[in-house]
Design a protein with these regions (language model features):
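Intrinsically disordered terminal tails
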Residues: 1-4, 43-46, 131-142
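Membrane-embedded alpha-helical segments of small multi-pass membrane proteins
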Residues: 3-37, 67-96, 100-134
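Perimembrane loop-to-helix junctions flanking transmembrane segments
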Residues: 38-65
Length: 142
């Protein structure tokens, strides 16, 4: 069960790294679209009809609203990227340390990032460490 836990944690850590990289790319795209450099592109798209919105007002007001939305999306994906990075760090650390505290930390950050594979690996690790503790004699009883 320990080996299965270690495998799930390593695969989950790699998955978190890949997901974090994808979130970083999406964050960069939204930041670029939120800059004033993309104002002309969006304004031209609104006037030509290639960019469709149901917003009331002038196209200039719609561009400002769209850029605010892009900036808020960049912030959301940036936060998700940070959580994925932390998840990758703690999950790979849990695969290496194999302690109950590391497994619990991996469960918490796996839940916060939305990556399910580290959750399974950490739960398997907790079960395996609990079985190992039951096999050891308790010196307090003897």
């Amino acid at each position: 069960m320990k080996n299965l836990s270690r495998i799930f944690l390593k695969i989950g850590g790699i998955l978190s790294i890949i997901t974090g990289a994808i979130f970083a790319i999406v964050t960069i795209v939204f930041i670029i679209l939120a800059t004033p450099a993309s104002t002309d592109f969006l304004l031209e798209g609104l006037k030509n009809g290639t960019v469709h919105t149901d917003m009331q007002g002038t196209p200039e007001q719609a561009v400002v609203a769209i850029q605010i939305m892009f900036l808020s999306m960049a912030i959301c994906f940036g936060v998700a990227m940070v959580f994925e990075g932390l998840t990758a760090y703690f999950v790979l650390k849990a695969a290496k340390k194999e302690t109950e505290g590391a497994y619990i930390t991996a469960i918490v950050f796996g839940f916060l990032s939305g990556t399910q594979l580290p959750l399974v690996g950490a739960i398997f690790g907790l079960i395996a460490s609990n079985k190992e503790q039951r096999k050891k004699p308790n010196p307090a009883i003897e």
